[in-house]
Amino acid sequence: EARRVGWGASGRNGGQVILGFGCEQPKIAAMVGPELSRRMFDWSIEGVRLVRERIATHGIDAGWRDGHAHVAIKPRHIDELKAWQDDLATHYGYALPWWDREQLRAQLDSPRYLGALFDPASGHLHPLNYTLG
């Protein structure tokens, strides 16, 4: 933001507001231990909640849309996503529903996707509108 708030990345990112981090929780747990990994994951959930709350509290026209689907486009992705689903439920108390191909197709009419984990708490917004408030 070398010029003004919203000019750079904060106004141009993809607008995804999703839980977690850029790598999987087991990797984080291996680096910082299970207790801090759990706290960090909880912070990410709180971050998503705060964004949603601020949009509502301040009446920001950010075009919020509920939900985020982590999709599988290859058979191996199904196994990876289901392992992640199990890890989140077992170690973090966060249950994500699995959408098979038909359930996903009802939401996203594309034959490309094999299935998805759906997170109803995450979402998408218009990043510049959110930044400008």
Role assignments for model-derived ranges:
Residues 1-12:
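Glycine-rich FAD pyrophosphate-binding loop
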Residues 5, 25, 77:
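Surface-exposed, flexible loop/turn segments at secondary-structure boundaries
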Residues 12-43:
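Glycine-rich active-site loop/strand segments that organize a redox cofactor
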Residues 31-133:
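Rossmann-like flavin
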